[in-house]
């Protein structure tokens, strides 16, 4: 299991933004915090780091997402 | 609450704190928790990778690094990290760490004992002390570099030491020296928070310095008006964020800088009061020198007048409109302008000249000395500034900005090291390209370097034209290559002797980042197997030389060169690995080193101050209340304690009158231009996922998967002309060598027609077989950014 702290920075277009927020809220891997202006605190929980990387890449590709910052990642070393 | 919920709640607190800070530009009300689990121990360290100098919090449990977080208390990164940073903990755990010394026997590397390995090194030194060299790195910690420097300059006294930083920032050094008389940027990262305009000169910080770039993007997100200008030879990720992307032809940057200066002069928008008070003018001489030849303002204006917009368009491919736009910005006094650059300007056969000219544009326009107004070079390695530029581990350098060629500097260094007068050799050693050329030349044909000890770098992949500079040595009798490293790099695999090293938080360390910030960390976990600190390796070799009678290993009182003592001042035999951590060797070496730092006003604080801080920017000066104060803006009265005479004081002025130099340098063509046989220009560089030659990042599965191999970017029109499709493998060939690699069309970077870009991180695709070793005549830094190549579809096997 990997737990990562993210900040998702949203663009300011209201329609796309609402759509993106709904998509993020529907994703069971994500726990959303309270947005602070354009910045949304997010916790991503995935089975492994590779899935986490793929998830971050997927978030970055959403049209209403300007950028994704990864703040911390909890990983296990074999 | 179970473990998963606990981790999620602490992660959410971290993310909320960062979001608050990003949104509001302020510290969160409550600091993020430092622990995510009761049995994880956290401590601070600077990131192992680039020169930005982000601080991370390192979580350890059971003798392993198990978690990484951005350090909320760090001014540099304010809790953020890039994709490499948050995986830095995994750097220690590649499957193939070197854990035992290895000696080449009958063509194979076989394990040997440390005792034997050290004796072999010592045998090589004693067999020919003059022909023994150390090739180091901007990844050395400060104490590691200092120990190697002292061994070579103060002990063996042959000055044969040079670092890989010669390949990445030597032209920035000569640019600062020739302009201000002293090295390293006057400004700092705070300028990024205050600038109205940021000009990236051939620089792609969105990938190379992403955390710094995020400061710019975040300002915009908060509503700040910030103009970002991308001066570039190809479209990059930085271009995507730029307000204006201005493409120029490779080597056209000198013409652009001269063209801006010409328009400032022609329009009368230069800053006459600043220039008349704080600047002199200089022009190039033949042979070139850092002092140049004086010129009057009228001569300078006359020389610059040749760089009309039409001529700049011809030389650089920049439109008169774009040039006028740049000159308009620099001509405005109401704006604060920061220039950023890195390898694009430094890896350049005119590297010193373009550095001088960009400083000159800032000085001529008065965009200097106010927060946000700064010409700032960035570095690529975590301690290129701290260990190379400040410790002076270059062939001509001594610590603290002193040089071996000046008698008074040698005398001062001999005093600090308690050496007999005359010990330090006044003749500089060989710079990097020359060192390796001589190592790859037969001994009876002038190849007078016969042993090189490589520490913390990978010259078999990072030197230019490696088939000329590196590989011939591997077949020459009498040449012996020693490599200290953590992984079996290409260099290690070509070595005669391999010494396994500890890395990053497996040892104590100190780095110095791009903004004069000195950083410290403590050992947190043990290195694997028999891997040991590089600093210990150097001291252990020195001690064996001492024991076998080498006279240079004693000071003038007969004490060992590295006289490490306990609290009662009794020597501690730290050359014995079992005793190495009985005392803090780093702290003692640093306290000795920092005595050098006052000569050029690069004052460092006591070691203990760095233990408390997330780095301090020099000069760090003790205050009347015995606290230590860092300096953000150098040469500026009110912040720099040594600037006392006027608002700005260049107190190490080349002309000894507290003035900086504004230079004129003419445009010159690159050493190799496209022709019928080799019609395209190759530029090499980096990607965000990987660092240097990828020896660490390619062993981090997440980063390796994200960018698994090198590629070549070419323009779609060139691909069509060559008949190659996206992903197809092509051969890139120069007059020196060739490589096969896949094409990436319309990818992350997009060069214009006629140009090719290849990243150099992939050890399996050796692009430096293709590059050329021509270098800047002053800095001796090679040009990796332009050489003539041809591309063809790969022939069928």
Regions found by a protein language model. Name each.
Chain B
Residues 240-248, 517-528, 699:
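Short beta-alpha connecting loops at secondary-structure transitions
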Residues 117-132, 188-196, 303, 324-338, ...:
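Glycine-rich phosphate/diphosphate-binding loops that line cofactor/substrate pockets in enzymes
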Residues 146-229, 254-258, 359-493, 502-509, ...:
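Extended redox/cofactor-interaction regions of prokaryotic respiratory oxidoreductases
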Residues 503-524, 530, 750-753:
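Catalytic or ion-translocation cores adjacent to nucleophile or general acid/base/metal-coordination motifs
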Residues 534-603, 677, 693, 697-713, ...:
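Long, contiguous, secondary-structure-rich segments that constitute the structural scaffold
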Residues 135-141, 314-318, 342-349, 380-381, ...:
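Conserved short loop/turn motifs at secondary-structure junctions
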Residues 105-111, 269-320, 525-647, 682, ...:
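N-terminal leader/propeptide and maturation segments of large enzyme subunits in energy/redox metabolism
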